[in-house]
Amino acid sequence: MVVELKEYDSASEMAKALEDEISRTKSLLGEYLRRLDDIRSLAEKSKKIREVVMKLAGKKAVQETLGEITVGNLSVILDANPFHELTAIEDVVRSQQERLLALQKAREALKWMDQLGDTEGLKYIVVENDGVPEKILFKIY
């Protein structure tokens, strides 16, 4: 989570920055969704092959340990398989979807600013949390 202060000269400049962020997030989300489809397909194939081999070998599927170790606050997966990657991409997609929703809600909440008209002599200081506006300070200069 990154909190930043950004300064804008007009409501339209702030709206454009928000639109750009929404577009970037949509594009990124689209890329992740394509990867998710590819990995999901690979994970399903991997699962089917594993089930067939286990059945032919006459063995029961054993619950595997994830081969996961924790180093400080970092989780490290050793010998990652398609299921590990699928889980990681699902987490990223969920996060990007939540971010996109927050950006779109912020855009809706800021529509009233279009009616301000000429705001010469006014700066917009915006507190953003991961690129999502949370607070706007009007500063007269």
Where are these regions (language model features)?
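Short, charge-rich amphipathic segments
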Residues: E21-L36, E85-V92
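Extended alpha-helical coiled-coil "stalk/arm" regions
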Residues: L28-T70
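Short, glycine/alanine-rich amphipathic alpha-helical segment
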Residues: A61, T65-I89
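N-terminal secretory signal sequences
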Residues: V2-K6, A17, S41-V52, L56-A57, ...
